[in-house]
Every structure is written in structure tokens, then in C-alpha cells.
């Protein structure tokens, strides 16, 4: 409810797993009721999972978990996890990131036993989220009419100020640098 009250675009719940396994997994919304949110959630989950796997964590995959008895307003099977179903009802994807198993000696020693290792997990999460949102480092493109800045999403900075590499730049309605 809080995420919806502040007009969130997504909800991310950070967890450590336990129970005798190893590796990372990310839960995302099912495709029932608001399939668009299920699709967006799947893309977000995969983006985060890809970054975690790049750290060397075993991939348990991206997953959905359906409720055994609850239904969405359209009568379809509801998501099991409350943060995912409430995010979906509010109109944005919610995911649960299970980083590693705290009761796995290997996961603990490789990914959880220092601030530096925990920071790497956090940065992987952030990078995956930024890539999903199309935010992040882009690159300058020189064209006949001047310079443009292209984001990693492929879109250009248009009609806005942008802070890039320590400097502010303004881009006109066609995406050309003015300052």
C-alpha cells in the first residue's frame, strides 16, 4: 500500500533464502489478471537475475508461485506472495529477490560473509533494475546536426536537462545538445 501511495513504478523485496538449497532466484507476477504486469515483472526479474548470475551465483531461475485458493477480481488464480499480488493490484510489477541461501556454507562464504560481498549483491540488484528501466550509462553520438546522448535503452535524451559524467547538459526537442 505504501508503494502505491508514493506512485511507485515497481516494488522490489530483498530476501535471503534458507531451507537447504543454494543459489539465487527471483519471483515475479503470473500472467493472470493484468498480464501486462506479469510480462513486465518477468522482464525485471530476468534483468536482476542476469546480474546476480554474473557474480557467479548458481541460478535457480526466475519463477512464479500461484496461490492454491485465492483469486483475482477476474476469477483467475492469484499470485501467492502478498507483495507481488498487491503490487499487481496497484498497477505495477512487484518482485522478490532471493539472493542466496543463508544456511548454505558455500553461498554464505562466497556471497554473504562480508560487507563487500553484500554490497556486490546490492549493486547487482541496482544494475538489473536500472537496465530494466532503461536508465544508466549511455553514450554520446555525433551526428551532422550536433551531439546527442543515447541511453542504454536506445532512446535519446530529449527536451530535458541531463547530468552526465559530472556535467549538466540540455537537450532540445530533437535530442541535440544545446549546452
Explain the meaning of each model-derived region.
Residues 1-136:
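Active-site-proximal helix/loop segments of hydrolytic enzymes
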Residues 136-179:
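Extracellular adhesion/carbohydrate-binding repeat motifs centered on closely spaced tryptophans
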Amino acid at each position: 500500500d505504501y508503494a502505491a501511495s508514493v506512485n511507485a513504478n515497481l516494488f522490489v523485496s530483498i530476501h535471503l533464502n534458507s531451507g537447504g538449497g543454494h543459489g539465487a532466484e527471483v519471483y515475479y507476477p503470473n500472467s493472470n489478471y493484468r498480464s501486462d504486469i506479469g510480462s513486465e515483472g518477468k522482464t525485471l526479474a530476468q534483468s536482476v537475475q542476469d546480474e546476480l548470475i554474473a557474480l557467479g551465483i548458481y541460478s535457480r531461475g526466475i519463477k512464479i508461485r500461484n496461490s492454491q485458493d485465492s483469486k483475482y477480481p477476474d476469477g483467475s488464480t492469484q499470485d501467492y506472495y502478498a507483495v507481488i499480488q498487491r503490487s499487481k493490484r496497484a498497477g505495477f510489477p512487484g518482485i522478490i529477490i532471493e539472493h542466496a541461501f543463508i544456511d548454505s556454507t558455500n553461498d554464505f562464504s562466497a556471497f554473504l560473509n562480508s560487507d563487500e560481498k553484500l554490497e556486490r549483491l546490492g549493486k547487482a540488484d541496482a544494475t538489473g533494475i536500472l537496465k530494466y528501466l532503461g536508465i544508466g550509462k549511455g553514450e554520446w553520438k555525433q551526428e551532422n546536426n550536433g551531439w546527442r546522448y543515447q541511453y542504454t535503452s536506445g532512446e535519446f535524451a530529449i527536451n530535458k536537462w541531463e547530468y552526465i559524467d559530472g556535467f549538466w547538459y540540455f537537450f532540445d526537442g530533437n535530442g541535440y545538445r544545446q549546452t
